[in-house]
Regions:
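Pre-Walker A adenine-sensing motif
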Residues: 1-10, 205-208
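Beta-strand-rich binding-surface signature
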Residues: 5, 16, 84
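Hydrophobic positions on the alpha1 helix immediately C-terminal to the Walker A/P-loop
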Residues: 30, 34
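Short hydrophobic/aromatic beta-strand immediately N-terminal to the Walker A/P-loop
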Residues: 17-18, 46
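The conserved Walker
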Residues: 19-23
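Conserved lysine of the Walker
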Residues: 27
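P-loop NTPase motor domains
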Residues: 35-45, 52-208
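Gly-rich Lys/Arg/Thr-decorated short loops/hinges at beta-loop-alpha junctions or inter-strand turns
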Residues: 13-16, 109-110
Length: 208
């Protein structure tokens, strides 16, 4: 309808919204327009973009006669523009998916979530909690997987057996299972997620 702009009031954006449709019906374009509108109004937007379709927000679009005639027919006063974006990635600059690395320190991740990631059973999870508790009591900050592996190896060694006794004991068999699970996670690339600095969700609300 010429002269009428279809827009969504900003106060309505705190409600749930579903964008659905068949392939090629404009779902990605709809998300892009929503993000553009929010960015233009000073609101930060977090988009999970697996295929990279939305990275075009960083570049101003190229004009063409066909585009201008279409927008004119729809009553739109179109002008190309770019928007500030920041690419987040699990891999970071040293991987095939460059971007600001999203990381978490082992200490912040915690033993319960890590036990789930490692598919540990209840006994193994409890042992991992004891290991975390000992490290915390010693003031040891577990940053990445090698840090955790070093602590487990120490506690199950001859030098660390006295320390191990103070936390109730962790069998070498259980420690071996945890160490093998850590190695498996690392071989699958999971080690890239752990490191410093840890990701702060407050950064998602940062405005330039």
């Amino acid at each position: 309808m010429p002269g009428v702009s279809a827009k969504m009031p900003l106060p309505m954006f705190n409600r749930h919204l579903l964008v659905a449709g068949a392939t090629g019906t404009g779902k990605t374009r709809t998300l892009q327009l929503l993000a553009e509108g929010l960015s233009a109004n000073g609101s930060s937007v977090l988009l999970c973009d697996v295929k990279g379709d939305l990275t075009g927000l960083a570049e101003a679009g190229a004009s063409s006669d066909k585009l201008l005639s279409r927008t004119a027919a729809n009553g739109q006063d179109w002008a190309s523009s770019s928007f500030p974006i920041e690419l987040l990635s699990l891999g970071g600059a040293n991987s095939q998916f460059p971007g600001v690395p999203v990381r978490a320190q082992i200490s912040d991740f915690g033993p319960i979530l890590l036990a789930r990631a490692l598919s540990l059973n209840t006994t193994q999870e409890q042992a991992l909690q004891l290991i975390f508790a000992w490290a915390d009591g010693q003031g040891l900050e577990l940053i990445d997987l090698p840090d955790l592996r070093a602590v487990i190896s120490f506690l199950t060694s001859d030098e660390g057996k006295d320390e191990l006794a103070t936390i109730g004991g962790v069998s070498k068999a259980t420690a071996g299972v945890i160490l093998r699970a850590l190695t498996a996670l690392e071989s699958q690339g999971g080690g890239q997620f752990f490191g410093a600095p840890g990701f702060d969700t407050a950064d998602l609300m940062r405005m330039d």
